[in-house]
Swiss-Prot record:
Lineage summary: Bacteria, Bacillati, Bacillota, Clostridia, Moorellales
Role according to the record: Involved in DNA repair and RecF pathway recombination.
GO cellular component assignments: bacterial nucleoid
Family: Belongs to the RecO family.
Keywords: DNA damage, DNA recombination, DNA repair
PANTHER family found in the cross-reference section: DNA REPAIR PROTEIN RECO
GO biological process: DNA recombination; double-strand break repair
Pfam families: RecO_C (PF02565), RecO_N (PF11967)
Name of the protein: DNA repair protein RecO
Organism of this sequence: Moorella thermoacetica (strain ATCC 39073 / JCM 9320)
Length: 267
C-alpha cells in the first residue's frame, strides 16, 4: 500500500528518467532491492543529488507508490571517496555492485548480501582490489550455498591425490578427479596453492585479508575460475569484468593465462 518508509541502502544503478528525474536501483538493508524515482535530481540545486549517486550508501525516506517508490529525502552515510579517486578501485566497485545486483532479486530482502557489499566496498578503499574481488566472490558463493567442493571430486567423491594441478568445473560444482574430467563443460586448471588460497578466502574475515600475502600467480588462477563460477550460477555475463580488463585492473592477478582447458562435446 502507498505510504512512507525509511531504509538504509546502497545505490547500485542510476539512469536518466524524463527531463530532470532519475530512476535508481537501490539495495536496501531491510526492504530488499527496489527501484525508486528521484524527482528533479538532475537540476543543479537539487538537495538529493549527493546522496543518490551510484555507489552512495544513504538513509532514504521513500514514498511507496502503486508501482514505483519515490525518494523524498536522503541522508548520506558513506560516499566511498577513495573509490571515486582511483579508476582501478572504481572499476572493481562496479564489479561488486554488479554481482550484488545479480544475486538479489527485486523485492527480495537479503541482509547478508547487503552487509557483504558494504564490507566489500569499504575494503576496496584500502586493500588490493583484485584480492577484495576474490574474497567477495568466494563469500558470495558461500552465501548462496554454492561454495565449490575442492577437497575431493565433486562428482564421485574420490580424494584428490598428488600435488599436480586440479581441474575445476563450474558445471560440476567443484574439483574433478582424472576419471571424471572432460564431460562437465569448461574446466579450469588450478594449482594446489590456488585451491588452498580459495579455501582460505572462504573463511577469513576482512581484517585478516590485510595480512594475507598475495601470490600473483595464484591470484591469476583464481581470477579466471572464480568469476566463471558466479557467471555460471547467475546465468549471465558480468560485463564489468571487461572494463577491469580494459584498464589493466587485474594486473596483480598475474598473467591471466589460466583459460578453460577442456570442453565437453556439444557445449
Amino acid at each position: 500500500m502507498p505510504g512512507l518508509f525509511q531504509a538504509e541502502g546502497i545505490v547500485l544503478k542510476s539512469r536518466d528518467y524524463q527531463e530532470t528525474d532519475q530512476l535508481l536501483t537501490i539495495l536496501t538493508r531491510t526492504h530488499g532491492k527496489l527501484e525508486a524515482i528521484v524527482k528533479g535530481v538532475r537540476k543543479p540545486r537539487s538537495s538529493l543529488r549527493s546522496g543518490t549517486q551510484q555507489l552512495c550508501r544513504s538513509r532514504f525516506l521513500f514514498y511507496a507508490g502503486k508501482s514505483l517508490a519515490t525518494v523524498t529525502q536522503c541522508e548520506v552515510q558513506e560516499i566511498y571517496g577513495p573509490l571515486r579517486q582511483d579508476l582501478k578501485r572504481l572499476a572493481y566497485a562496479y564489479y561488486l555492485v554488479e554481482i550484488a545486483d545479480g544475486v538479489v532479486m527485486p523485492g527480495q530482502v537479503n541482509q547478508a548480501m547487503y552487509l557483504l557489499l558494504q564490507q566489500g566496498l569499504e575494503a576496496l578503499g584500502e586493500l588490493e582490489p583484485a584480492l577484495v574481488a576474490r574474497a567477495f566472490e568466494a563469500r558470495t558463493l558461500k552465501l548462496l550455498g554454492l561454495a565449490p567442493r575442492l577437497e575431493a571430486c565433486a562428482l564421485c567423491q574420490r580424494e584428490l591425490k598428488g600435488n599436480g594441478r586440479v581441474a575445476i568445473a563450474p558445471a560440476a560444482g567443484g574439483a574433478l578427479c582424472p576419471e571424471c574430467r572432460g564431460h562437465q563443460g569448461r574446466e579450469y586448471l588450478v594449482s594446489r596453492g590456488g585451491v588452498k588460497t580459495w579455501q582460505q578466502l572462504n573463511r577469513l574475515n576482512w581484517s585478516y585479508l590485510k595480512r594475507l600475502q598475495i601470490n600473483p600467480m595464484l591470484m591469476g588462477e583464481l581470477g579466471e575460475v572464480m568469476p566463471a563460477f558466479l557467471e555460471y550460477y547467475l546465468d549471465r555475463r558480468l560485463r564489468s569484468r571487461a572494463f577491469i580488463n580494459e584498464i589493466g585492473g587485474d594486473n596483480i592477478d598475474g598473467p591471466g593465462k589460466n583459460r578453460p582447458v577442456a570442453q565437453a562435446p556439444g557445449t
